[in-house]
């Protein structure tokens, strides 16, 4: 569960390293976001000479959360960190690679491009 002020790692090769959630999209009173939800982030750390700079604001999709997610078969899946992938205006990923595993719930949220770029889908 991601809420405002939550720090996340950026799991793509755009050059950003750490981001902070500044808004959970999908309703004026919405407080939490889970895997597959779109949030607005601000880049807090970035590597030099990258396409994203510190202080830039983007939309991102959540690909990993530390809070467990219950699946229909009764199993739970959770990850070691909270991570997101930066999106462009068309809600497709800005980067060409996705680092680390991503959750299968992204398939249900219609982020097939992110799933295909990921090295491992759990």
From Swiss-Prot:
Pfam families: Ribosomal_L14. Signal peptide: none annotated. Binds to 23S rRNA. Forms part of two intersubunit bridges in the 70S ribosome. This is Large ribosomal subunit protein uL14. GO terms for biological process: translation. Belongs to the universal ribosomal protein uL14 family. Part of the 50S ribosomal subunit. Forms a cluster with proteins L3 and L19. In the 70S ribosome, L14 and L19 interact and together make contacts with the 16S rRNA in bridges B5 and B8. It comes from the Bacteria. Keywords: Ribonucleoprotein, Ribosomal protein, RNA-binding, rRNA-binding. One of its GO terms (molecular function) is large ribosomal subunit rRNA binding. One of its GO terms (cellular component) is cytosolic large ribosomal subunit.
């Amino acid at each position: 569960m991601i809420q405002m002020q939550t720090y996340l790692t950026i799991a793509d090769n755009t050059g950003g390293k750490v981001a902070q959630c500044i808004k959970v999209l999908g309703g004026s009173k919405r407080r939490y976001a889970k895997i597959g939800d779109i949030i607005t982030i601000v880049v807090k750390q970035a590597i030099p000479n990258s396409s994203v700079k510190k202080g830039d604001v983007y939309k991102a999709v959540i690909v990993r959360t530390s809070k467990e997610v219950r699946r229909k078969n009764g199993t739970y899946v959770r990850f070691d960190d909270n991570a997101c992938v930066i999106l462009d205006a068309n809600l497709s990923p800005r980067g060409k690679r996705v680092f680390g595993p991503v959750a299968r719930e992204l398939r249900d949220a219609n982020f097939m491009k992110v799933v295909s770029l990921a090295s491992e889908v759990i």
